[in-house]
Amino acid sequence: MRGFRPLLSLLLPLSACFPLLDRRGPTDIGDIGARMNWAQLAEGHPPNSVQNPQPQALLVVAREQQASHREHTGFRLGRQDGSSEAAGFLPADSEKASGPLGTLAEELSSYSRRKGGFSFRFGR
């Protein structure tokens, strides 16, 4: 019994430094409470705080923004000479095929190889 008291007096202050974690298991795979460190728990941040958004939610938001951006990209180039809207995106036989990256660069910089130079748009 005498050897138990010094050990208890050492472990009791340690239990005050490290709070007990939630004994329930994680509710889903992306549970943030399972990955929190002791410093965040000591500061009092709840496990599902706004400071630590779930990565799956961020991925869904990013995909939605990319999808909505793709819907509007064809209408930014202004008037096109071709009969269809997609004619401006397809390279002619004499032009080098640049792919989606080159098309995006042309759209962002207002440079058109088909027209032979820069075209400036006012208002943006």
UniProtKB/Swiss-Prot annotation:
InterPro entries: P518. One of its GO terms (cellular component) is extracellular region. Keywords: Amidation, Neuropeptide, Secreted, Signal. Residues 18-79 form a propeptide. The modification Phenylalanine amide is found at residue 122. Expressed in the brain with highest levels in the periventricular hypothalamic nucleus and lateral hypothalamic areas. Expressed at moderate levels in the adrenal gland, eye, heart, intestine, liver, lung, kidney, mesenteric lymph node, ovary, placenta, Peyer patches, skin, spleen, stomach, testis, thymus and uterus. GO terms for biological process: grooming behavior; locomotory behavior; neuropeptide signaling pathway; positive regulation of blood pressure; regulation of feeding behavior. Residues 63-101 are annotated as: Disordered. One of its GO terms (molecular function) is orexigenic neuropeptide QRFP receptor binding. It comes from the Eukaryota. It holds the Pfam family RFamide_26RFa. The keyword Amino-acid biosynthesis does not apply. Residues 1-17 form the signal peptide. It is found in: Secreted. Belongs to the RFamide neuropeptide family. Stimulates feeding and grooming behavior, metabolic rate and locomotor activity and increases blood pressure. May have orexigenic activity. May promote aldosterone secretion by the adrenal gland. Ligand for the G-protein coupled receptor QRFPR/GPR103. This is Orexigenic neuropeptide QRFP. It comes from Mus musculus (Mouse). The lineage of its organism: Eukaryota, Metazoa, Chordata, Craniata, Vertebrata.
